[in-house]
């Protein structure tokens, strides 16, 4: 039958595995080298191979997949280490050689491949997925499965999109091109100055003169006693450098030469000028004239601005909050002024600071007087030192005098100078007094000490440098007594509007602040005021007002769950913070809460009611975070209530491929494991990619392992899992009859030897499993090892489960005790069992029996081979369909029309589930090899019957010879009557007779011995056939039909759920 499949979508896989004529193919050299070898393939994505071309060769990558060098660069051949050194075992290799001799290394921690010697360039490539491709051709015989490492891009080739796809690359960019970040303007200026300096240094005579000029200038600057003196030296130096450079033809042609010389001189003299200016203006600096630190506590309302009008009715706290935010932004920018080492850099800081302070807020523009006051406030709060030195430098060392006297820069410097001039003794004394009062009030509130009523009443509008009002200070310090006093006795100063508008720099409302510091009493007071005094729309607006982290009140409700009943219905439970977390998600992650189960249950009930009241279905997808974590992933305990909701996806992986069960296994969430394992929708054997780990592989706690295995044991009598290297041995975990034990891999192979001895004609593929166990790990790649062991252990599960139904498994014993039990000799047969005389009619009957069964089982094997190939086709083509769909969506998402591109977003979900396909193929393979084992037994016994006929023929010939030579078999005459000749002849005859007699005896004995073997083997085979027929029917039902159908149904349910979630995302 033809051994190739319909064309595979991935060109590289199709070229290697699906060649109809390997002996005449362009890759025949590769096929001859790979004939009986074990290897793995690094396969770029199908999308890449179909959409890109190699710039150097001009060939499409799909065509390049039929060129030896490209293909061989993606194939790694592995030698079995046990062939040379029996005790050697590969654990994890990191360095590999491709088929054409190129070097690469695999970094398992971050799943990347790094190319090395032999490749034209060093590339770092991500491993996306690892799987095993079943062998379906007849020319690669090294293994039943080939490991496939799916990688993000090819290991070689200069990639550009195909011509017809260039339109997409122009819109979205070549995803394989190096994305260089645009340099900042400041970096560009620095580069120009450094390049200019390098040019000067490359001309020795110019470099010497320039160096001498700077050396002399620096010495004179150190001796200068006035700003004018420093400025004079600086100007003279600029002129000298300009003269030196203008006389040199190699430098005087440069563009913007004056600006370049200015920047260059500044670069060389900036530090010296700053040091000397500090000495000259030291006594004029604010920090030396006054107690500058005492001014830090100044409040915004204590400097004159148009945001605090005399008419209280026109006052807007919302505008003040916005202004405080602008001041804080400007403050952070002003603090960086000392880090700038250029005139333009410092001036840019001041200009940006002015721009931030001058922003129009809620229709209120900032006039000149307000701007000056805000700059004074900024200087007090920022505590930036050396401002007089900065002003002196900016006003005396400019590139041109007109640049700082007119325009925006002139206005900025004049305002800066006016702000510094504001600080004279009278104003400073006044500010200091106000700051002292502020600090006294705040300290009294924070320490819960008595506050002077008069002092408090005259400073009700003060705010800290963090933008906190008195109400906010009371809330954060848990001083609810003063808070109550303020709200009760100063209602006009703290009207409802101000309570609603009050925010700190994080834009958190007073209620959010109360929840953040767990001030339940304050939260209750505030919520009562809001619920009783506001309309429903105002309540919703306030409770859903986001802070700087885009979190609303609901994101903090776990801090005081008692508020939920009264305010829960007003929350927007689908609002997401800057991390993409909804309030429900945030509550589920509040692991430190003492009453966690109570909180999540109440909040979930409230959210379910909220969806019902809004006539909306519960939308699980919107409660996922950007990393793909669902509510099930993050819930620490109590998932019962979540599993009761419709449309919950219990198997959905996050962006790292981790399902909820894997998360529970990793973080020891035992109660969640016990609950979710009872859910019929669970696919407990899902594999994480690209690490290829199951939920059992993630366990580190024996209790967690036992919890999963106890639940699994209800479905499977024997569970084999988790190959790990411990105590210098490969060990596997086996769970049987409620007992978990770890056994070495060598002992399991010893166990299979025991089964082979005890059941020599068993139909189970014991020898195949022994070979698979022996070769585990030779690829040296952890993901491949886990995937190989996963499938091999599933086969061992079936074998041991069957043995468990026929007798004692002994798998609850310790390793040494089990080894003693398994150390049995070959069963001894009695003489009557070993030597049996069979008649030709019996042999004919056995041969007829064997030939009939051989023909029947060969038919069955052919059917299984065809069925397996069809299963492989279905598996591969299913992935091809998913790949094409995702490729289509990817291209659509790059469309230039945003409306069109948006329709392709958020739909590229992983709909492909390989478990049922792999299980179906694996189970068919197990049954096929069981049939092959029986066929081998038939052929072996047929060979013995042929040998029996040979010995039978020899025996008949010997009997014929005996009858011919000794027809009567009478006794010879006595020696007394014989002469010499008669005696000699009779002696020869006697010797011949004895020899023939011995040959007859030996031939008969051999025939009986073979007959005994045939008889015993025939009976064993007959029993084996009957057992296989019984096993086959049950196997069809349990492992071919029922389990696969059940698995496929559950998988399709997940696919449909993802479709529903996707549609919800686009509604």
Swiss-Prot record:
Pfam annotation, one family: VPS9
Family annotation (PROSITE patterns):
VPS9 (PS51205)
This protein's source sits in the domain of life called Eukaryota
- Mention any one GO cellular component term assigned to this protein in its UniProt record: transport vesicle
Signal peptide residues are: none
A GO term for molecular function:
SNARE binding
Q: Identify the InterPro entries for this entry.
A: Ankyrin_rpt-contain_sf, UPF0507/Ank_repeat_27, VPS9, VPS9_dom_sf
Query: What residue ranges are annotated as transmembrane?
Result: none
Domain VPS9 intervals:
280-432
Q: Which SUPFAM superfamilies match?
A: Ankyrin repeat, VPS9 domain
One of the protein's GO biological processes = early endosome to late endosome transport
Family to which this protein belongs: Belongs to the UPF0507 family.
What name appears for this protein in its UniProt entry?
A: UPF0507 protein KLLA0D01133g
Q: Which organism is it from?
A: Kluyveromyces lactis (strain ATCC 8585 / CBS 2359 / DSM 70799 / NBRC 1267 / NRRL Y-1140 / WM37) (Yeast)
